[in-house]
Amino acid sequence: MLVGTNIRNWGPTATPECLVACARYADQSTLDSIWVNDHIGLPPNFDHNPYGISPDMAHMLDPLGIACFFAAVTSRIKFGTGVLILPYRPALLTVKWLATIQTLSHGRFLLGTGVGYLDEEFRALGVPKRERGKINDETLALIKAAVDSDILTSNNEPLVVKPRLQPPPIYIGGAPATALPRASRVGDG
């Protein structure tokens, strides 16, 4: 059995000192992995709280930036996103981030993905929420393609993108009705 834990990348504990202490402690422990969350921000006067989100989550450090940080301050432990909301980011840029993280960490990154749910975040980013599943699947397809080729096509424009992505394990989060079929198609766990 593998055991991981979430490290808060939000609220008052989202400081370099706390993150490095937690990551190094986990690296020296018997834990297998550490995980961070993803939100861009929260609406002011956040009053609809379907998932127990704290208002402190408005102060959240970016999970991909933290992954680079973890790569630099640890040597053994795997680390991942629980979950990275793929529709919030351009697909090609996400692939580049993942390739960079995998290179810096010598392949220790774990990619947990999801489609997101906060209407306000989608509107603020100019991403149609109704297209989140489609965007998510297109991004996952590009991630899979990046494992097999240095030439990727985005918006009908082929580009050589290096370093080639070392395949991270892909974990699919979300509501069972949509997440389970997606997990069976493209997920690793």
Label every model-predicted segment:
Residues M1-G189:
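Active-site-adjacent structural elements that line small-molecule/cofactor binding pockets in enzymes
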